[in-house]
Regions:
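Interfacial segments at transmembrane-helix termini and the short loops linking adjacent helices
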Residues: 1-3, 189-221, 328
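Alpha-helical transmembrane segments of polytopic membrane transporters and translocases
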Residues: 5-6, 113-114, 127-146, 171-179, ...
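Helix-loop junctions and terminal segments of transmembrane helices
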Residues: 22-23, 136-174, 230-236
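Hydrophobic alpha-helical transmembrane segments
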Residues: 31-79, 91, 95, 102, ...
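Interfacial/gating helices of multi-pass transporter permease domains
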Residues: 55-56, 91-95, 99, 117-137, ...
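Interhelical loop/hinge segments that connect adjacent transmembrane helices in multipass membrane
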Residues: 55-62, 68-111, 115, 149, ...
């Protein structure tokens, strides 16, 4: 209860207000509140720890600090948005059940691997999966931060029917997200096994060195990140009902394929199920967004997606293979190799991204069918 207090406060009192703030392209408000809460929380934890306070009270203090965030969101919304009270009407949230269904499908997709490994494989493999998932999930969170405010921007342009500007901004976001994904995930592919080797040093309950599994799971998350602009367009256009089968199909494919492959190879099996399901959803959203929102050929989206995915896979596999023959004995060496890898991949990718962003404004006319 103590640990979950801040999350409870977020969903019970702050999520609607935060959604409104983000939709108005004021993500900086949330960032400022998050930074302030993190600083105050760090100071409070240090102070309570120095006072030798029990762990329960330390966690309670931390949760109470983060529980204040919804109140700040509420105060900001109340001051800047004079919202009238909505009467009873069926037009309000008319697609709420479809939205809930997609969230349930997403929840099933995200948790299928852990559940199946727990039920049908050695429980020790859950620990292996959790370590790799922790690292890759952190990289995914960093990548997703670059799409902040994207859906709100798309929604504004769709509402104003500014198709040319929507295409241009879509290609800019797509170029940025794909470039960031290629850099971060290819570096992660090269460095994740050496990191796990250091992180689990001295732990012998399971074999934590699983490079093939790591690359497959990494590709699944990378594909998911690269498709953020395409998956964000239907949400911005309020097309939840029209795209529901993409979410439902993703969950179904993941569950069915993972169940079929888990007896062949538990870790690789569930990772392949996740990757296949993610690719299906990505292609589905590319097809829908290209045809019904952007009005551009699917082939144009598929070519960029396939090229980026292939490049990422080659870089990650090559980096992983290269570092396998190098002894990395401590975190300092790992950081040095990480910086070298980031420089080698990041510099040319940054140049490509910069060049494409400059050219994007001239591609509007060529994107038409």
């Amino acid at each position: 209860l103590t640990i979950g207090l801040s999350t409870l406060a977020k969903y019970m009192g702050g999520l609607a207000n935060l959604t409104l703030i983000v939709a108005d392209q004021r993500q900086y408000v949330n960032n400022c509140i998050m930074i302030a809460a993190a600083v105050v929380n760090a100071a409070a934890v240090v102070l309570l720890t120095q006072l030798k306070t029990q762990l329960l009270w330390v966690k309670l203090g931390s949760s109470l600090i983060f529980a204040v965030r919804p109140l700040l969101y509420r105060l900001y919304v109340k001051k800047h948005y004079p919202l009238p009270k909505a009467g009873k009407t069926s037009a309000v949230l008319d697609q709420k059940w479809t939205g809930i269904g997609q969230h349930i499908a997403y929840f099933l997709h995200m948790n299928t691997d852990i559940v199946l490994l727990t039920l049908f494989a050695d429980v020790k493999l859950v620990a292996v999966y959790a370590v790799y998932s922790m690292v890759i999930g952190s990289v995914r969170a960093i990548t997703e931060s670059f799409s902040s405010g994207m859906e709100a921007k798309f929604g504004e342009l769709i509402a104003k029917e500014r198709l040319d500007r929507l295409r241009r901004d879509f290609w800019r976001y797509q170029t940025l997200i794909v470039s960031v994904s290629v850099v971060l995930f290819s570096c992660t592919g090269a460095l994740i096994v050496p990191f796990v080797r250091l992180y689990t040093k001295g732990i012998t309950d399971a074999d934590y060195i699983q490079p093939v599994f790591a690359l497959i799971l990494l590709m699944a998350e990378a594909v998911n990140c690269m498709m953020l602009p395409c998956s964000g367009l239907p949400a911005a256009a309020n097309r939840f009902r029209q795209t529901r089968w993409g979410a439902y199909g993703e969950a179904a494919i993941n569950i069915i394929l993972s169940c079929a492959l888990i007896h062949w190879s538990p870790l690789i099996g569930v990772a392949l199920g996740t990757l296949t399901a993610t690719v299906f959803r990505s292609v589905y959203y590319m097809a829908y967004s290209g045809r019904h929102i952007l009005h551009i050929p699917l082939s144009k989206l598929l070519v960029q997606f396939a090229a980026a995915a292939a490049l990422l896979g080659v870089l990650a596999a090559a980096g992983c293979r290269l570092l396998q023959g190098i002894a990395i004995d401590n975190y300092f060496q790992w950081v040095l190799w990480g910086l070298a890898t980031l420089s080698a991949v990041g510099a040319p990718t940054a140049f490509y991204c910069w060049k494409r962003l400059r050219e994007a404004k001239y591609e509007t006319d060529s994107d038409r069918e």
